Amino acid sequence: MSKSLKKKSHWTSKVHESVIGRNPEGQLGFELKGGAENGQFPYLGEVKPGKVAYESGSKLVSEELLLEVNETPVAGLTIRDVLAVIKHCKDPLRLKCVKQGGIVDKDLRHYLNLRFQKGSVDHELQQIIRDNLYLRTVPCTTRPHKEGEVPGVDYIFITVEDFMELEKSGALLESGTYEDNYYGTPKPPAEPAPLLLNVTDQILPGATPSAEGKRKRNKSVSNMEKASIEPPEEEEEERPVVNGNGVVVTPESSEHEDKSAGASGEMPSQPYPAPVYSQPEELKEQMDDTKPTKPEDNEEPDPLPDNWEMAYTEKGEVYFIDHNTKTTSWLDPRLAKKAKPPEECKENELPYGWEKIDDPIYGTYYVDHINRRTQFENPVLEAKRKLQQHNMPHTELGTKPLQAPGFREKPLFTRDASQLKGTFLSTTLKKSNMGFGFTIIGGDEPDEFLQVKSVIPDGPAAQDGKMETGDVIVYINEVCVLGHTHADVVKLFQSVPIGQSVNLVLCRGYPLPFDPEDPANSMVPPLAIMERPPPVMVNGRHNYETYLEYISRTSQSVPDITDRPPHSLHSMPTDGQLDGTYPPPVHDDNVSMASSGATQAELMTLTIVKGAQGFGFTIADSPTGQRVKQILDIQGCPGLCEGDLIVEINQQNVQNLSHTEVVDILKDCPIGSETSLIIHRGGFFSPWKTPKPIMDRWENQGSPQTSLSAPAIPQNLPFPPALHRSSFPDSTEAFDPRKPDPYELYEKSRAIYESRQQVPPRTSFRMDSSGPDYKELDVHLRRMESGFGFRILGGDEPGQPILIGAVIAMGSADRDGRLHPGDELVYVDGIPVAGKTHRYVIDLMHHAARNGQVNLTVRRKVLCGGEPCPENGRSPGSVSTHHSSPRSDYATYTNSNHAAPSSNASPPEGFASHSLQTSDVVIHRKENEGFGFVIISSLNRPESGSTITVPHKIGRIIDGSPADRCAKLKVGDRILAVNGQSIINMPHADIVKLIKDAGLSVTLRIIPQEELNSPTSAPSSEKQSPMAQQSPLAQQSPLAQPSPATPNSPIAQPAPPQPLQLQGHENSYRSEVKARQDVKPDIRQPPFTDYRQPPLDYRQPPGGDYQQPPPLDYRQPPLLDYRQHSPDTRQYPLSDYRQPQDFDYFTVDMEKGAKGFGFSIRGGREYKMDLYVLRLAEDGPAIRNGRMRVGDQIIEINGESTRDMTHARAIELIKSGGRRVRLLLKRGTGQVPEYDEPAPWSSPAAAAPGLPEVGVSLDDGLAPFSPSHPAPPSDPSHQISPGPTWDIKREHDVRKPKELSACGQKKQRLGEQRERSASPQRAARPRLEEAPGGQGRPEAGRPASEARAPGLAAADAADAARAGGKEAPRAAAGSELCRREGPGAAPAFAGPGGGGSGALEAEGRAGARAGPRPGPRPPGGAPARKAAVAPGPWKVPGSDKLPSVLKPGASAASR
């Protein structure tokens, strides 16, 4: 019989599941044999008749291999660990077993040495086996050890002779060579060595295996060449499915795994899902029919295109690196050639770039990797259905000018349901995993109906059969929604739990504002930004809903971008147009932001060098000539902007030439030569581009497919341009309006969504000034080694301006010369930042840093004569200015903030010294107490004449302290000198030392607060938070109270000669905390030059009701907020554009472990914030449960709502539940909000008077934790437990002195970890919460003063000295170095001799006695390797005696 007729099933078809329980004796009724220690799979020994308590499934058979226990893969584990997993699991046990035979017998060595195609079940199982082996064994190698490697932890380094002996003795499960060195995987010992006793419990049920904490397969071991055995031909009937997208990937044997593993040198751990051992019959048949039986029978794989590379994620998934464009992609570029349209695919196959996901919660959905979105409907069935419905041919490439979509006349709006014209109908829909099964449109304006846009096939609405497209939604559960915003209605639908029903009253008779059946409506300019776009046709299909629709569904109520009448743009004068053409018609409210104003036109001459791949930009036809469509190589096209009109090329006028002729001219330019371009920028904006794009420039900054330096490709190919870059030598690209680049839509519209959060309406897309007193300029900076060389201030409250802080000498901004301290930042790479949070802007800058450059737009106040204000005697240089229509009221507010200094402003230093009354305050303390005040330093400030020149002030005075008793010191007093020594220009750390060395008394020379402030702004309490006293936003938001008559209002004061007053920065406390974030790439992320990281994940279940595309980080839980806890529309500001938008409600049931539930909480009514999960203990029930994450909001505790709940009540509820707790959680962003962020039920400007104040070290260049990074290991001393060992009191009740640290604050906050003390004395202390933590280790390569990364906590010097009997680290001695991060902010310091904190409580308790604590450090300052924890809740005695370098959580500085 020929091979082609052989149809033997794969061994996975024989896998069966048995569900059993423990019998009355508590036994399972069978014995286990084998195990990795014997080089075998675990398999069933004797199955005792009548002793196995079967619940369902098949019977257990002796000698069968055991693959999984309750979905935990156990192949590769020792018998000890398998038994531990079984012991940990509750009844019933679900065992997956398979009969031995063929390629799977009990011999692990045999199976591991077989070759399988990547992506196959066997290949995945091999990787899982290796992962499990490395929990208990360490690979050995004959190569010399490298710097930073720990012998016995990373590798066992042996001689070649020893290696050969091991191999001969059969002690190695795998062996091979890599780069002429031998590598092997020894059998693990039956009983683990002391080194590996403490491995993580990631193998336990419910855990999520990840790279964190779990031993990884070393790259060298995975890549070693071995004498692999071919599997029997009848068994190998699978071909791999890379990423599960139904696309066949050409085989590559496992020994040729790519040598790139991102930035790390190790291959990652097992993929999240275990292998799927059973497959649908039709899939099996398809495999049988179409796939060869042996890998070598397949045709040779096509080579990857030039400069492409294959790599693997930490979960073992394949991705591809394009070194040409420095981007990564999930899609194999070789397969794009074989791609076919979805309508031509069979029903059981998927188009190129699609992946099918079977989710246990959300059911089956599909991932579109090309457009980075998800949907429930099968794309093939959808495409065929659309083809039948619309019978729409593919549109050929063309250069025709854009046509505007044919929007209909807007119907007369009414809020009175009785005045609606049409047929009323009511229906009841039950919410399913797909939501209600329809999408809505409208509600973007107050006078706009909300209408049904589409009914999703097979959804609840479609099954009900009553709802139709265009139906106006009138009532939702007796609530009239006429006049409600889109976001309001979305939240109403989201608030309905799955499984519950909603009553709808609809009115039929109103057409949609556009015709969804009209093919013309698919013609959306790729870069025109619509408020309500019609469906977009991509690759000839209508089935792609853009992110723009997602915006209209999920964002807050988005104001119209123009306050003009809908058609007013037609009558605008065309003075600014040099070519005499008119802008295209704009219909209704769908005004592109680019078309709502004009800039001053200008001609610019640029010189661009043509490279081997072309010029690095594409052009497209437009009514006025050839415009730059896309910048593919930003660095190669300096000064060029998308939308620029090309006037001349090498002195040849091309304005009247056709697209093809201009392309030919560009082609004829020799490679390597300079080409001179004259471009026209400004005037009326192009119909489809903007010279200063709002969102479009962003796609060049990070999207895998947009930052191409690629030549053009035909747009009708069903694959993204990035994949075939090398195939097309042309450097231009025809512009087809029917086929916008999906990544452009994705990136642009995401940026729109985020830019519209809490931004008031404006008429111009540029933040032009409302008068002649401000000038805008664009600044392009390239990142240097030290970053962009400037600091960012502001953004503490929504609406507060973002300002340029200090410009670092000799940095990029300083050398450029155009950026000045005090400039207001308006755009970052085309993204508007007005009204955004400080963190949002910092993240934009981090993103730009990874791309190596940034385009900034700033506003600067202009003095007489229209010249920009000189700063520091430096001319601003020649800049182009733009003028457009005045903005709305928000512009007035923003500008007025800068019209005059606020009443709280500090005067210049000279004025302070001559005009203000200074006084000396002497504070005496006792031996056992501190001075009782906190100093805040604000050195990094703009250097203009109106800024803070006395940078150190009193930030807090502790009740009952010497500072409080002397009654001469007040919060806000500026400190000029300490003990007669001027501290104005002194670093904070030196001030700390100065006060620490002062002994029992200190003399402070101060400028009293009364001298700095007008009486109207005097604090209501001397010890009140400066944020509450001083911030104008805290007193009265100008947005809420714009009256110029208010004494505090900057509007009421005359304009000073200073160029710009930094409103809100002298006054706003939080900006002082965050102002010292220098604009550098985030050191916790790969540097911008390392582009080989895996692509961003976006494969997320479609969001509930509306099939929303997923967030950038698409492997997070779902996007939609299914059960909004409260209709309250006030939300936290969007602080990070990269944060996963996965606001998903879910329930977690947990049983208490030996040390409690294993999590801690933050927040409560007293802090004006909701309750959040603060941290998870490594070995606690919460982390084993696998669902709870740091930053999740707690909505209910044991069925009781947490709204307005105090911290103490939450603890009480958790304790009252006994051994179990049930929590309703709302998926968070991975960050715990700070206490001064506006809570959903508190005013954004509300102050927290009783909360502690903190400053920051001047050297602190770190941004707060980003959700893209894992939270640090949790602090077990704060887990919830009733026992005395676990402090479950309110984490930050500053009203309870007994719970305060010496500086009046709790010790812990999110991201700060403390070493679990090995000292029995310290562990036994009841006040464990105040026990000292490990000193933060400096990160490798950073100076100690900058090394205070989030995640490291300070030690209480006095407690450390008393409790541990050892000397406390000197950096902590005598001072409490505090940082305000919210309730529970912990002191933090830099390292030995550091003092990198910005707040000081002058506590001198153990100061003179403390000295540095000696201890080993990892080589090179690298972080210590974190050992794993044994699977299960067991703990082996003596594990605490491990070397500190191996202890989890131990920091270098404390060792």
From Swiss-Prot:
Keywords: Cell membrane, Cell projection, Cytoplasm, Cytoskeleton, Endocytosis, Endosome, Membrane, Neurogenesis, Phosphoprotein, Repeat, Synapse, Synaptosome. It is linked to Nephrotic syndrome 15: A form of nephrotic syndrome, a renal disease clinically characterized by severe proteinuria, resulting in complications such as hypoalbuminemia, hyperlipidemia and edema. Kidney biopsies show non-specific histologic changes such as focal segmental glomerulosclerosis and diffuse mesangial proliferation. NPHS15 is an autosomal recessive form with onset in the first months of life. Disease severity is variable. Some patients show rapid progression to end-stage renal failure. Seems to act as a scaffold molecule at synaptic junctions by assembling neurotransmitter receptors and cell adhesion proteins. Plays a role in nerve growth factor (NGF)-induced recruitment of RAPGEF2 to late endosomes and neurite outgrowth. May play a role in regulating activin-mediated signaling in neuronal cells. Enhances the ability of PTEN to suppress AKT1 activation. Plays a role in receptor-mediated clathrin-dependent endocytosis which is required for ciliogenesis. InterPro entries: GK/Ca_channel_bsu, Guanylate_kin-like_dom, Guanylate_kinase_CS, P-loop_NTPase, PDZ, PDZ_sf, WW_dom, WW_dom_sf. Gene3D superfamilies: 2.20.70.10, 2.30.42.10, Guanylate Kinase phosphate binding domain (3.30.63.10). Residues 109-283 form the Guanylate kinase-like domain. The modification Phosphoserine is found at residues 686, 884-885, 1014. Interacts (via its WW domains) with DRPLA. Interacts (via its second PDZ domain) with PTEN (via unphosphorylated C-terminus); this interaction diminishes the degradation rate of PTEN. Interacts (via guanylate kinase domain) with DLGAP1. Interacts (via the PDZ domains) with GRIN2A, GRID2 and NLGN1. Interacts with CTNND2, CTNNB1, MAGUIN-1, ACVR2A, SMAD2 and SMAD3. Part of a complex consisting of MAGI2/ARIP1, ACVR2A, ACVR1B and SMAD3. May interact with HTR2A. Interacts with IGSF9, RAPGEF2 and HTR4. Identified in a complex with ACTN4, CASK, IQGAP1, NPHS1, SPTAN1 and SPTBN1. One of its GO terms (biological process) is Wnt signaling pathway, planar cell polarity pathway. Residues 17-101, 426-510, 605-683, 778-860, 920-1010, 1147-1229 form the PDZ domain. This is Membrane-associated guanylate kinase, WW and PDZ domain-containing protein 2. Residues 302-335, 348-381 form the WW domain. It is a peripheral membrane protein. GO terms for molecular function: beta-1 adrenergic receptor binding; phosphatase binding; signaling receptor complex adaptor activity; SMAD binding; type II activin receptor binding. GO terms for cellular component: bicellular tight junction; cell-cell junction; centriole; centrosome; ciliary base; cytoplasm; dendrite; late endosome. The lineage of its organism: Eukaryota, Metazoa, Chordata, Craniata, Vertebrata. Residues 205-306, 869-913, 1011-1136, 1231-1455 are annotated as: Disordered. CDD domains: PDZ0_MAGI-1_3-like (cd06730), PDZ1_MAGI-1_3-like (cd06731), PDZ2_MAGI-1_3-like (cd06732), PDZ3_MAGI-1_3-like (cd06733), PDZ4_MAGI-1_3-like (cd06734), PDZ5_MAGI-1_3-like (cd06735), WW (cd00201). The modification Phosphotyrosine is found at residues 362, 827. Residues 302-381 are annotated as: Interaction with DDN. Residues 241-252, 895-908, 1238-1249, 1346-1363, 1399-1412, 1422-1433 have a biased composition (Low complexity). Specifically expressed in brain. It comes from Homo sapiens (Human). The keyword NAD does not apply. Belongs to the MAGUK family. PANTHER family: MEMBRANE ASSOCIATED GUANYLATE KINASE-RELATED, MEMBRANE-ASSOCIATED GUANYLATE KINASE, WW AND PDZ DOMAIN-CONTAINING PROTEIN 2.
